[in-house]
From Swiss-Prot:
The modification Phosphoserine is found at S42, S56, S98, S141. Part of the Ragulator complex composed of LAMTOR1, LAMTOR2, LAMTOR3, LAMTOR4 and LAMTOR5. LAMTOR4 and LAMTOR5 form a heterodimer that interacts, through LAMTOR1, with a LAMTOR2, LAMTOR3 heterodimer. Interacts with LAMTOR2 and LAMTOR3; the interaction is direct. The Ragulator complex interacts with both the mTORC1 complex and heterodimers constituted of the Rag GTPases RagA/RRAGA, RagB/RRAGB, RagC/RRAGC and RagD/RRAGD; regulated by amino acid availability. The Ragulator complex interacts with SLC38A9; the probable amino acid sensor. This is Ragulator complex protein LAMTOR1. It is a lipid-anchor. One of its GO terms (biological process) is positive regulation of MAPK cascade.
Amino acid sequence: MGCCYSSENEDSDQDQEERKLLLDPSNTPTKALNGAEPSYHSLPSARTDEQALLSSILAKTASNIIDVSAADSQGMEQHEYMDRARQYSTRLAVLSSSLTHWKKLPPLPSLTSQPHQVLASEPIPFSDLQQVSRIAAYAYSALSQIRVDAKEELVVQFGIP
């Protein structure tokens, strides 16, 4: 876990040259070791990558946008409008005929014929509400304490040989 470098040794010019070449790849020689020209692939810069990414996002967004202002703004003729209205009303009639059970039910349950009298009457006394709550708690307690004890077997074996 360390490096094998001693700071006591002075760097020679050749060591500094090698270090400079290793750290700065733009200063590499143009000839390869075998004498052929090296082919360096230039990596795209961060700015180019960012620009390409933004361009792809813009293209994707442009393909998903519907330009309403560029659409043909031709108005419908009167007979086309009437045909569509007739078509929609026949479709609604077919759909509403299949939902007849919804029409038969009142919008809200009617518990009384004169709800204004019920709403105008005196509120239920608090003592009555407490009594109903107490009775409900006793009923719950009684139901939760019901136990079934098995006195005999549920399946009885008959004497069949």
